Amino acid sequence: MNNNKTLLALCLGAGLLASSNTYAFWFGSSGYTQTQYPVVLAHGMLGFDSILGVDYWYGIPAALRRDGASVYITEVSQLNTSEARGEELLAQVEEIVAISGKPKVNLIGHSHGGPTIRYVAAVSPNLIASATSVGAPHKGSATADFIRQVPPGSAGETLLAGIVNGLGTLINFLSGSSSTSPQNALGALESLNSEGAARFNAKFPQGIPTTACGEGAYSVNGVRYYSWSGTSPVTNIIDPSDLLLGATALTFNGEANDGLVGRCSSRMGKVIRDNYRMNHLDEVNQTLGLTSLFETDPVTVYRQHANRLKNDGL
């Protein structure tokens, strides 16, 4: 974040915390989501904080704050390697620690935000109380592997990268992002395919299962690791994004997935659940809350997890 937007964002976070405390004083707060350390949300590929009044984490921050959580929303490069995004996130975490007065934070990362928060937890575990991934491709994505079949250096790759980088630039502009990192679609692709994920895991193995579909270490270097994900690409027929995720799900050749991430690839640390009736966007309550009528509300899942962190002393 640049200095001006950083100061504004963090001051707003502090103000919202004060507002939540005022709300609690007048109307009462259960304290259900009141974690010891701030909750810091990290978006995925092509993510943002808010665009044209629509939040990436739709309805989630307000629901967490309502019962006591201090919540900060970060924004990093829409398209880049896990390491580059991690460095951007680390700088913001350091600012949040400074302004909140708390020595650590609870990181929650969706999609590519999962490897991003893992990088921060690995290089600066002293700043991190917990790292939670939601629908994150820790062992790569079959969709990324499918796209990677486009020959490197080919005209097709150049065209595809140009289109995706353009989309990333547009999202960066519309969200008012302070990230000045260039859009790097090919870097993101290399981080999210199976081979790139394996290289990343070799450098940063914390919380990653050593078996094909097991659990990882629950705690490493004082950082607690958690994860959850969905396995239903199509969940609501009136949500237009379900059509896209239903199509991308075909790249998994029958493996359970959320449309972009396989069930086993999503597992890290303590697995809360890996088969919610949710697709990749449902996991952040998108599109606009159009999720399955036959599954727990995604917002409730985040509230339950905040309570879990609270009960774990985090």
Could you say what each language-model-derived stretch is?
Residues 210-314:
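C-terminal catalytic-base region of ester-bond hydrolases, centering on the histidine
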